[in-house]
Design a protein with these regions (language model features):
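A solvent-exposed interaction/effector surface
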Residues: 1-207
Length: 207
């Protein structure tokens, strides 16, 4: 049976619908950086997703099986979001978003395996995949919650997370390298907006 990160690490991918505190360890990802409104038709965000998935499936379907290889389900899309000059995120200013789109990598994928996948995808697709990065990141202490509903309704969930964190003796901590983080568990093309499942995670620190 294929290894499914969502099922094996439910604490990180299926938190309750009420806020909780969690410590997230270091992980490796495929990543593409960009800026602008993610809803823009044929915009940078949608192009980034195309590149991410192309490389993710190149790795999964590769005939080359590196040391430590195991069959797995490609993990869900994730995103880091911020805006210059704003502490947190302002959902009314989508054009100002800076973002990093992510797909988690299995532990057996080294930088060498990543480089091979970029080369293979570029040759097969006749496309430049150089914007895709090997991204290592340790998220650390966070507050998180499962948000169910449209993305534009997220501020209500985010406010509840901030209130919970404060009540537990924590403060939000959008410092260098710490961002608003979302994990997308639903296919937006097939799921009604009111049923979309999104893990929302924000960095905190003890006060």
């Amino acid at each position: 049976m294929s290894f499914d990160y969502k099922k094996e690490y439910k604490k990180f991918y299926f938190p309750p619908k009420t806020p909780t505190i969690v410590t997230v360890p270091a992980m490796n990802f495929l990543a593409v950086r960009g800026q602008g409104d993610p809803n823009q038709e044929d915009g940078a965000y949608k192009k980034a997703l195309g590149m991410l998935y192309a490389v993710a499936y190149t790795i999964k379907m590769s005939k080359h099986k590196p040391e430590g290889y195991f069959d797995y389900v490609v993990p869900p899309l994730e995103g880091l979001w911020w805006q210059e000059g704003i502490y947190g995120v302002d959902y009314t200013r989508k054009a100002d978003f800076q973002w990093v789109s992510l797909i988690r990598l299995p532990e057996f994928v080294t930088r060498e395996e990543f480089d091979l996948a970029i080369e293979t995808a570029s040759e097969k697709k006749q496309h430049d995949f150089s914007p895709v990065e090997f991204f290592s990141w340790e998220e650390g202490l966070c507050v998180q919650c499962m948000h169910i509903g449209p993305y534009d309704d997220e501020p209500v969930t985010v406010a509840a997370m901030a209130d919970y964190a404060k009540a537990q003796g924590y403060a939000l901590d959008f410092s260098q390298g710490r961002f608003h983080h979302e994990i997308y568990l639903s296919d937006v093309r097939r799921c009604k907006p009111e049923k979309l499942k999104t893990v929302i995670r924000q960095p905190v620190k003890c006060v």
